A protein has these predicted regions:
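Catalytic core of Fe(II)/2-oxoglutarate
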Residues: 174-239
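A sequence-composition feature that detects small, non-aromatic residues
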Residues: 4, 18, 77-82, 107-110, ...
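Structured loops at beta-to-helix junctions and adjacent beta-edge loops in soluble globular domains
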Residues: 52, 66, 79-82, 132, ...
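Non-heme Fe(II)/2-oxoglutarate
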Residues: 1-128
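Catalytic core of non-heme Fe(II) oxygenases with the double-stranded beta-helix
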Residues: 117-197
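Residue-level detector of functional hotspots within protein domains
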Residues: 113-115, 151, 206
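Extended aliphatic helical segments
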Residues: 16, 28, 39, 47-48, ...
Length: 239
């Protein structure tokens, strides 16, 4: 897929692209019988937790990264995938929901992050570290999107949500959240200080990262199954 010229990456051109059918429309989640955590519903679809554990930088700088062809400014280091290989593919490509991830060789070099995920005590799916180059708020708003975490997820399972854990200290950068794709009036920006943990229903809230720079930004992104146990863990992490 050809990427848009950087100067055209703004929400005004995005509206035009959408109306002309040049961008695939996002599918807004419908009500399902999946278990959803009350703690997320109480906080409107996202909840900011207290600061997470200290992780040495060697656990994210010495990994194998790849970039999707549509976004050359963003790279990912898979820690858990559908097959255990260092690949950027959805679990559905292998007939699986985004659960029961298998640790990759990258995870062997990130023992603190593995312990962090294991401490939550639940099922996880895709786990990856994002490495982001400086990105303006204009470009971030262009990149607002919904995830597709629950494709193939049986109704007997919990709803899959995502946790962001900020590894570098970028207080002038933010995770941008919106209920509606073009609803700037109700936009939320979560500052990305080192240790910031944000749990998001990423199929309900449009989201993107704005990174002021000048250095690269690193964060861990974890797909998690909603359960009573995870609800309790989240509440234990509230400020």
């Amino acid at each position: 897929m050809k990427t848009a010229d950087p100067l055209l990456k703004n929400e005004y051109s995005k509206r035009v692209y959408a109306r002309l059918g040049l961008r695939r429309p996002f599918t807004v989640q419908q009500e399902t019988r999946h278990y959803r955590m009350p703690v997320l519903q109480e906080h409107g679809g996202h909840v900011v937790l207290r600061s997470g554990p200290e992780i040495p930088s060697t656990e994210w700088t010495n990994l194998e990264y790849s970039t999707p062809p549509t976004d050359p400014t963003t790279w990912f280091a898979p820690l858990a995938t559908a097959t255990g290989e260092n690949i950027l593919q959805g679990f559905w490509d292998f007939g699986k929901p985004d659960l029961d991830g298998i640790w990759t060789s990258n995870a062997d070099r990130a023992p603190g992050l593995v312990r962090y995920v294991d401490s939550m005590g639940g099922r996880f799916g895709r786990i990856q570290i994002i490495r982001q180059e400086p990105t303006s708020i204009r470009e971030a708003r262009w990149g607002l999107h919904l995830d597709d975490n629950n494709r193939l997820n049986p109704m007997a399972n919990g709803w899959v949500v995502r946790l962001w854990f900020q590894l570098t200290d970028d207080p002038d950068s933010s995770l941008v959240l919106r209920r509606g794709q073009f609803d700037r009036a109700n936009e939320v920006r979560v500052p990305l200080r080192r240790g910031t943990q944000v749990l998001v229903d990423s199929e309900a809230l449009f989201h993107s990262g704005c990174h002021k720079g000048p250095d690269r930004r690193y964060a861990l992104i974890v797909s998690l199954e909603s359960t009573d146990h995870l609800d309790g863990w989240v509440r234990s992490q509230l400020p």
